[in-house]
Amino acid sequence: MYQIIVSKTAEKFLDKLDSSDRERIIKALERIRVRPERFLEKLVGEKGYKFRVGDYRLFIDLDKGNLMISVIKIGYRKNIYKW
């Protein structure tokens, strides 16, 4: 089972959400801990993956060797792709 690490940026975004959205994202992350490859999509032109949870997108770095899922950034679908 993979370990989940959340960046400070992603944690700040989670703190701003209402409790129902926050819980939905946390439950979704718990669900992908066993086999994350089934749920993640490769980012085009970038390294890493995206994970969809409703209107939110999570940018994730997957370390298969150390069994770690790193949540790099969380944002709304319409805003997250603008760096």
Regions found by a protein language model. Name each.
Residues 11, 50, 59:
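Short aromatic/hydrophobic contact patches that present stacked aromatics
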Residues 6-10:
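Basic, amphipathic "hinge/linker" alpha-helix immediately C-terminal to the N-terminal HTH DNA-binding motif
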Residues 1-5, 16, 20-23, 53, ...:
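Enriched for short, Lys/Arg-rich terminal
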Residues 14-17, 29, 43, 67:
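Generic leucine side-chain signal with a strong bias for well-ordered alpha-helical environments
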Residues 27-52:
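A short, surface-exposed loop/turn module that caps and links secondary-structure elements
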Residues 17, 31-35, 59:
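Histidine kinase transmitter module recognition
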